[in-house]
């Protein structure tokens, strides 16, 4: 499975940034943008752009910081706020989306093995965003006492709303804090400026509002990268961070490091 929407390649971060830049530039001063990572037809964002393995929590927070300090009206797709991942289905019968069955036949008729075809479906199928919400660690993730329309993702004993609510440093509580801060800083009406739009590893931008300037710095890779900031960081305070990397004009970001800095207007 090497082409089309089912192929999983190296993240084209430059293309992602250019898409955001295009819509913000087009609407600046005349309209209002919507910002969101995904919807019911796309893979779970922490599996698609992040890392749902060793860096699950860290990359989920990185994705939170990166998107939701941009101007516009923010939309969170259910499950994103607790770091829900793609499904872990092992059999074709576990899927429900009709597209899956057609594509499976296409894959295998072209020589793909069952496991290769299944991995492509686990990576990209629309059902990834349609599995039952994971409320707690009880049967069927607390979603229902009946049999759900499709299987619950197997990591629900670890990734669920109850566990997230009980942990003050969880992804869920970070979402709540960030959205309160969006309101306080007037993020929705800000002016967006990217640094190094062509860079394919880091995501750096400022958002200037009536309250001050927000600076977001994020590493989208599972390896360290070096960044040199074009904005003088000395007047900024660190407000959010998922890492221990000290802020500096030039710094090495560890995998999925992200930080949000703020300079208050006097």
Could you describe each region identified by the protein language model?
Residues 1-266:
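Active-site and adjacent substrate-binding regions of carbohydrate-active enzymes
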């Amino acid at each position: 499975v090497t082409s089309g929407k089912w192929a999983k390649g190296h993240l084209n971060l430059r293309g992602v940034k250019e898409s955001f830049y295009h819509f913000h530039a087009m609407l600046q001063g005349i309209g209002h943008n919507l910002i969101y990572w995904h919807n019911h037809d796309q893979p779970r964002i922490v599996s698609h752009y992040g890392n749902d393995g060793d860096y699950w929590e860290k990359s989920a927070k990185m994705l939170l910081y990166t998107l939701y300090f941009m101007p516009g009206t923010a939309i969170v797709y259910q499950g994103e706020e607790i770091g829900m991942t793609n499904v872990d289905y092992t059999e074709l019968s576990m899927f429900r989306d009709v597209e899956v069955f057609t594509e499976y036949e296409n894959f295998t008729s072209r020589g793909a093995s069952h496991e290769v075809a299944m991995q492509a479906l686990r990576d990209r199928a629309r059902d990834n965003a349609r599995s039952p919400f994971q409320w707690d660690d009880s049967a069927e993730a607390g979603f229902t006492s009946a049999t759900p329309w499709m299987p619950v993702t197997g990591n629900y004993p670890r990734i669920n709303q109850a566990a997230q609510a009980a942990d003050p440093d969880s992804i869920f509580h970070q979402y709540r804090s960030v959205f309160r801060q969006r309101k306080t800083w007037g993020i929705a009406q800000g002016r967006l400026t990217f640094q190094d739009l062509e860079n394919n590893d880091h995501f750096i931008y400022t958002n200037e509002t009536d309250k001050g300037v927000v600076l977001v710095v994020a590493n989208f890779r599972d390896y360290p990268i070096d960044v040199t900031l074009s904005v003088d960081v000395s007047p900024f305070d660190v407000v959010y961070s998922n890492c221990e990397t000290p802020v500096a004009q030039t710094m090495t970001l560890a995998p999925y490091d992200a930080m949000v800095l703020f300079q208050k207007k006097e």
